[in-house]
Amino acid sequence: MIFKIPDLLTPEELAQITDQLALSEFIDGKLTAGWHAKLVKNNQQLSRQDSTYDALKGLLQKALERNPLFQVAARPKIVHSVLFSRYTDGMAYGRHTDNALMGGSSFLRSDLSFTVFLNPPGAYEGGDLVIESADSETAYKLEAGTAIIYPSTTLHRVDPVTSGERLVAVGWVQSLVRDASQRELLFDLETVRRSLFAQGGKTDEFDLLSKSVANLLRQWVE
């Protein structure tokens, strides 16, 4: 399941992030890539040793924590390995899949990947995020403050930036529910449950559906 979150970040949060990134130290993105991804990764990233990194990462994580769509659809156990990336003229990230395990010896699983767009699409040419499916591919170039969340199992790429500057935050989620089809089923049931409550309050049908959602969580949560 791929889903977008418009306005994940407020205008004030966006301004805070972009203002600080403009003054921060960026390093070669290959330093955080797997051995095969290094061959196709050409971007820059905010150094994790930079004095602003922890604050910006915390701001982004809080935005995800407060967002109900992200919480219900992703069922996050932990959001990890956050990176702030910059692409300028000629930079790209070729076709790749994300590492299954991240965080060094912590062995954090990547179930879901996310990209948060930090500047408007008019600020750069090219630079689309392209996600492949079995028989097609879809390009995304979204408004500043918007997030897209997609399975880490996919092949995807960032097309070359031909002018301007592309700023994004990327990260990964280890979900409480490992199986993608189970997460989607829980999301659909939760959507129906909330719709029933909005229409009729705490009815017998709402209670029965709530029981089923809770019992599925008991079976599937790790």
Residue ranges and their predicted role:
Residues 1-76, 81-83, 185-222:
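Non-heme Fe(II)/2-oxoglutarate
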